[in-house]
């Protein structure tokens, strides 16, 4: 809850003359901004697991802010297919829901000098939420990197996001895919990456291996993302 005051107070979440010295966000509590303000320090009390996590915040962030390996915003839900595509980006604007990928769990986030935006549109199809509550009928991201439709007892916490699809879609589970905005297909060919460093990710965005060159890698047969290209190893 924000308090708009005429005088300064030594307390959290007090906004005076368009500035908040210490903003504390908690994923068990609702949050709403009636008008833009500047936050000198922001603490976000929510944890993320290793892997992919949904997120929505009232200020601009990049992956360094989020301590993330990558961040991605919603692109599309393929017509007549149970696949949802996200595009990896450098930063995300305020009130735009996104997915952040982590190599390890994080239990708290801190930010400095953030412009906190008025709570307005939090997305369509992929929708952010600043309010804990029911997730019945909404598609939430699971630990197996699929979006699953919530049942009667499904709940969500604040500062997360979910998919909302028409009932006619029928699908109870949707798979997750990522693109870097340049290469979206699977390249079934020999690809040279030269002598530059190589990073190998699973299709779910988890880092599998790193090497100084392809010759140093010993991968099992499968599909991988290698230096932002999808590659089949046979």
Listing of model-derived features with the role each one plays in the protein:
Residues 4-66, 87-187, 232-234:
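A short, polar beta-strand/turn micro-motif
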Residues 30, 47, 70, 82, ...:
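Generic serine detector
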Residues 72, 139-140, 224:
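Short glycine-aromatic motifs
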Residues 78-86:
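Short linear interaction motifs
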Residues 83, 123, 197:
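A residue-level signal for beta-strand positions that form part of recognition/binding surfaces
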Residues 182-234:
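C-terminal outer-membrane/trafficking sorting elements
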């Amino acid at each position: 809850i924000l308090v708009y005051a005429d005088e300064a107070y030594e307390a959290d979440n007090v906004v005076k003359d368009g500035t908040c010295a210490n903003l504390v966000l908690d994923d068990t509590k609702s949050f709403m901004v009636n008008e833009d303000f500047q936050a000198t320090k922001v603490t976000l009390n929510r944890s993320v697991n290793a892997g992919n996590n949904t997120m929505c915040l009232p200020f601009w962030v990049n992956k360094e802010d989020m301590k993330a390996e990558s961040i991605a915003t919603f692109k599309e839900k393929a017509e007549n297919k149970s696949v949802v595509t996200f595009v990896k980006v450098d930063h995300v604007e305020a009130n735009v829901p996104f997915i952040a990928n982590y190599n390890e769990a994080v239990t708290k986030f801190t930010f400095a000098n953030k412009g906190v935006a008025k709570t307005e549109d939090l997305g369509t199809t992929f929708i952010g939420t600043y309010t804990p509550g029911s997730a019945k009928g909404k598609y939430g991201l699971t630990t197996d990197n699929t979006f699953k439709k919530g049942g009667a007892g499904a709940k969500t916490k604040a500062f997360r996001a979910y998919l909302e699809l028409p009932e006619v879609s029928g699908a109870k589970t949707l798979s997750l895919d990522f693109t870097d905005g340049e290469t979206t297909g699977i390249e079934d060919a020999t690809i040279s990456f030269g002598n530059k460093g190589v990073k190998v990710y699973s299709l779910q965005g988890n880092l599998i291996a790193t090497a100084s060159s392809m010759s140093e890698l010993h991968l099992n047969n499968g599909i991988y993302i290698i230096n932002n290209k999808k590659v089949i190893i046979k």
